[in-house]
Amino acid sequence: LRLVTTTRSQNPISERWPDMREAGIGCLDAAAAVGRDPFKSAVRLWMEKTERHDLLQPVDPSLIQSAATAAYWDRLLEPIVAAHYALRTGRQVKRTRALLRHPQHPWMLALAGREVVGAPDVQLLECRCVGMDEAELWGAGLPDYVRIQMLHRLAVTGAKTIDVAALICGQDLRIHRVERDEVKISRLIDAEREFWHCVATDCAPLA
């Protein structure tokens, strides 16, 4: 795994990441930035990045750690998904707590996440927990918006391959592979650059 310019801090990355997200486009922002996220529009993402919180629906702070949210179960089950990926594939997985920034495109950010150690064919692992409301999108394979997110991560990290281990509805573990594609990454960077120009110039993207 070749890591590009890395930002580190003594503070836990989970505490710093909400602030850092406003300084660039993260992996989970990528599909929304290019208008391909079924759950978030480019306009909403722009409002978040430009801190137009008065235009966004308020989020109840008590729900952030609530067991009623998908994010809660994601955080809880991700280590289990990673462990079962290692068990099924026989590969060693190591978590890396580093925030990365692309050297040529400083607005492109990504968490290093999990690294697959000593495997010649894959370098990174992404773990997802897919609930009932999202499972249909995974019926035909890896959803397009997730593939875009993974291409963003490959672009920032410099890695060639990432496996996506997705636990569907708590009982069906599926593994999808995303290979580095320079043509698609170049197009993604161009589209993300246009979005970030909208953020930098405080001009909303087209709906």
What are these regions (language model features)?
Residues 22, 32, 40, 57, ...:
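Low-complexity, compositionally biased segments
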Residues 71, 84-200:
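Nucleic-acid nuclease catalytic cores
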Residues 1-76:
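Charged, glycine-rich intrinsically disordered N-terminal tails and low-complexity linkers that flank
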Residues 199-207:
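Residue patterns forming the tRNA-binding/recognition surfaces of aminoacyl-tRNA synthetases
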Residues 23, 52, 91, 201-202:
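A generic structural signal for solvent-exposed, polar alpha-helical segments
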